[in-house]
Structure formats: C-alpha cells, structure tokens
C-alpha cells in the first residue's frame, strides 16, 4: 500500500461511494465478459453508480487477457477435449482457469479517483485489500503479491486484472477456491514459475 494513500483513507473513499450490487448469478463465460464491458460503460455514462458484481461460472472457461495470443497461451485442442470454452476479457493480465463451483469472480466498477495518488501496481493491492482481509477473517493466511495475485502458503488463490477507460476503472479478481491444479499444465502454456 502506498504511503500517499493509507489503507484507512482508501476505506474512507470506498465507504463514501453509493454502491450498486449486482446479484450473484451464474452465466456463460462470454456473457460475463459482455457484462463487464456494458456495466463499465454504464458507470462511465452516469447511468449507474459505482458497482460491485459477484459472479459464478456456468461453464468451464479459459479467460485470456486482452493482449494475449490464444495460440501461445492455451492448448486449444485440450480445452475442447476437456469442455472448456475460451474467451477474451477487456482487461490485461494472464490466462485464468475458471470452473463452476470452484471459482468465484468479483468486479468493481469505480471512478479512477478512488485510486488517485497510487501507481498502477499499488491500485491492485488497494482494490484487493478487502479480499485479503476477508481471507484472514476466515482463517486463511492470505497476502498480496505484486502485481496482481493473492497467495496463501500453499500458492496462488486469486488473480486480478484491470481495464481503465475515460477516468474509470474495472477491477476484477478471480478466486480459485477449489480448482484442480492438475488442469493447469494440460490447458495453459505457462512456465513453472507461474504455476507456483
């Protein structure tokens, strides 16, 4: 966390917002990607206030970042054979493996002023601080690891990504609470360092 924006200052900024909550609903992967784009645009346009959305996956999916190459990141044949759809999100970051009942994601759609004074890297830690605190409250010894991971002593448990548009931020974090780690090397082409 940056000294320019202490945690209590961020908590104050977040508490001042009139949050809109999107009910927790399972949808197919492509629908979730479309919802992120539409909701961010509606917040930007002033048609809705700052919004938090918790979402469940109705199908297994591999979600790649906006600048990634499907061919370089994903074994397409293995994904097809194992029943995973492949979709692209509007934010950056790496490929996420998402499974119904094993993965939950949340999105925050907020004005960028919430993280003003923070570097791009620091904004990840700031917007995920409540999740790290929630893990701790549940007895999970979670910590933040730059640039966009939440980890426990057993490894990565969540990854975040952001998109910024016209003074607003979409920040979403995917929590893999019961993922089958044996699927990662079968589906995602990553180095061993990313699997730890």
Outline where the language-model segments fall.
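Catalytic beta-strand/loop module used to bind and position nucleotide/cofactor moieties
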Residues: 76, 96-196
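Active-site loop/lid in soluble adenylation, ligation, and acyl-transfer enzymes
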Residues: 2-85, 89, 196
């Amino acid at each position: 966390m940056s000294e320019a924006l202490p945690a209590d200052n961020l908590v104050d900024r977040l508490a001042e917002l009139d949050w809109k909550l999107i009910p927790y609903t399972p949808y197919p992967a492509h629908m979730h990607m479309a919802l992120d784009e539409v909701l961010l645009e509606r917040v930007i346009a002033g048609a809705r206030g700052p919004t938090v959305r918790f979402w469940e996956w109705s199908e297994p999916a591999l979600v790649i970042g906006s600048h990634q190459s499907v061919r370089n990141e994903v074994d397409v044949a293995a994904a097809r054979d194992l029943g995973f759809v492949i979709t692209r999100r509007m934010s950056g970051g790496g490929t996420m493996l998402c499974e119904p009942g094993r993965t939950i994601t949340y999105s925050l759609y907020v004005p960028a002023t919430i993280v003003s004074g923070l570097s791009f890297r620091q904004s990840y830690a700031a917007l995920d601080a409540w999740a790290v605190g929630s893990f701790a409250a549940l007895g999970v010894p979670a910590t933040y690891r730059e640039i966009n991971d939440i980890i426990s002593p057993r490894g990565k448990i969540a990854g975040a990504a952001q998109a910024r548009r016209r003074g607003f931020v979409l920040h979403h974090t995917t929590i893999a609470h019961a993922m089958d780690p044996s699927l990662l090397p079968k589906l995602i082409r990553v180095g061993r360092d990313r699997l730890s």
